[in-house]
Amino acid sequence: MLLKELSSLASPLSQPQVEKLKQLTAELNAVQLAWVSGYLAATANASGNLAQLAPVSDAQAAQTVTILYGSQTGNGRGIAKALAEKAKAQGYSVNLASMGEYNVRQLKQETLLLLVVSTHGEGEAPDDAIELHKFLASKRAPQLNNLHYSVLALGDSSYEFFCQTGKDFDARLSALGAKALLPLVECDVDYEAAAGQWHADVLSAVKPLIQTTANVVALNDTSSALAASESEFTKQNPYSAEVLVSQKITGRGSDRDVRHVEIDLGESGLRYEVGDALGVWFSNNETLVDEILAGLGLAADTKVTVANESISLKQALIEKKELTQLYPGLVKAWAELSASPELLALSEDKEQVRQFILHHQFADLVANYQLKADANLDANKLVELLRPLTPRLYSIASSQSEVDTEVHLTVALVEDEHQGQARFGGASHFLASAEEGAEVKVYVEPNKHFRLPEDPQTPVIMIGPGTGVAPFRAFMQERVAQGAEGDSWLFFGNPHFEQDFLYQTEWQQYLKNGDLTRIDVAFSRDQAHKIYVQHRIKEQGQTLWQWLQNGAHLYICGDAERMAKDVHQALLGVAVEFGGLSSEAAEEYFETLRSHKRYQKDVY
């Protein structure tokens, strides 16, 4: 029966091949058929060419759940992959792909579409979702009256444009006539429970609309990042690594504490590419936890339940709960618990909340806004109020071509002062305080959107002020190992030359050896008027434009809030002044570079 259906569908097999397949399968028992099925699936997966399959026919599309993900980090990919596996287990035929690898012309043939998408920057689509996002917003987007869909949006509520890209997809699909299986699901940084519930709900919603095909399941995973060779060590199962070095690399007179951290990956087998990030799990500072407990009058040894585990309240606050990053929901909840008129008024103003959380931590709420008498905040209610601790991502500052089983980071200690009280970033303080031999739980977070050119002859322009220089240290190590002959140009900036020139001797050695073609620096406080990297870009605009015309790849790493925007504006100015482009054409020019992977950003 199945082979008869195969010959009538848009099969990639010729009729003689179908006949041969019939002859072979007729001679096999059930066990042998199962073995052949697995063998063929593995062979197809290993070929790496699944993305090139011809579009499915309408008959096939009606039997297929298409799951697309767009995510700057691996969170969206992980959620989508887990959903695909659950759908497969229930007998559904599944097409799983990154939005960046999806053929938008296939959209009008889809009948069941499940999207997982994050939001990047100020409400922007992540890199691999940009094309689909633009297509749906364009006049080319078709009517989708036959489509049922659901969107899971990932975001961080501490940012203004929370889950904006997911909202965009949901609104646009609805406007094009598609029918929502479920209301839009918006997930904060503690997304696991909500994502798991969405898995269950959306598969239940899909069930009446599709026939299961348990014997013919095609999991078309077009992402190499989901290969079977993935490390066993993940965000959920990190590797316990050893800290080898945590060395301050800013001068004694610097107002910044930046550390060069070296971590031993030992025999973990963890591999990373230059451009990837390292996920770091950390523990909250014990002194900070003691301050919070004292402020709330709660006993440290009180038993609480976290993720079905009974532990002491103090252990929960040190190991399990987020204390150093506020978010709007917590500010609003604390305003109600404290009944503070000041905090209640502030919590209703999004911009005021956004500014407040930049310079306050949970301990500041406890210290400055006392609970009202009937708040009844006991130990278990406290741990329910606080969201789970999440790892921090750091751009990797090394290449395994040079450091082998080590991984290097460039970590700026996050430090703020409020009413005379110093507050530190959770992960940065943990790493800065780590002594040689200390244990840290880590995993590799791939970043396929920040990669060196495949051809080592290609010139590269690297713009990385402050700790944004980290991945470019890795780039240079990799280029030297490759014997790259392509030119390389670094723009670096920090407050002071004598105190803040990160990895100065390494850059000088690269210049001396001819591995680094040129470096332009901007030390903002070494003269009366402030000079930043964007000023150096403008000064060197003619040369920079010539490099771009010669095929250079352009990279930016560092602060997304100000630096990346200012640098982008400077680049637009270069295109206008030295390329003779209009403002609109300049934007289109850099958008074309981005789509060809010649303009890449790692900003945060």
Swiss-Prot record:
GO terms for biological process: cysteine biosynthetic process; hydrogen sulfide biosynthetic process; sulfate assimilation. Pfam families: FAD_binding_1 (PF00667), Flavodoxin_1 (PF00258), NAD_binding_1 (PF00175). FAD binds at residues 324, 358, 392-395, 410-412, 425-428, 604. GO terms for molecular function: flavin adenine dinucleotide binding; FMN binding; sulfite reductase (NADPH) activity. Signal peptide: none annotated. One of its GO terms (cellular component) is cytosol. Residues 236-453 form the FAD-binding FR-type domain. Binds 1 FAD per subunit. Pathway: Sulfur metabolism; hydrogen sulfide biosynthesis; hydrogen sulfide from sulfite (NADPH route): step 1/1. Keywords: Amino-acid biosynthesis, Cysteine biosynthesis, Electron transport, FAD, Flavoprotein, FMN, NADP, Oxidoreductase, Transport. It catalyses: hydrogen sulfide + 3 NADP(+) + 3 H2O = sulfite + 3 NADPH + 4 H(+). FMN binds at residues 71-76, 118-121, 154-163. The keyword NADP applies. It comes from the Bacteria. NADP(+) binds at residues 524-525, 530-534, 566. It is an enzyme of class 1 (oxidoreductase). Its cofactor is FAD; FMN. The keyword Flavoprotein applies. Residues 65-203 form the Flavodoxin-like domain. Its EC number is 1.8.1.2. Belongs to the NADPH-dependent sulphite reductase flavoprotein subunit CysJ family. In the N-terminal section; belongs to the flavodoxin family. PANTHER family: NADPH OXIDOREDUCTASE A, NITRIC OXIDE SYNTHASE-RELATED. Alpha(8)-beta(8). The alpha component is a flavoprotein, the beta component is a hemoprotein. Component of the sulfite reductase complex that catalyzes the 6-electron reduction of sulfite to sulfide. This is one of several activities required for the biosynthesis of L-cysteine from sulfate. The flavoprotein component catalyzes the electron flow from NADPH -> FAD -> FMN to the hemoprotein component. This is Sulfite reductase [NADPH] flavoprotein alpha-component.
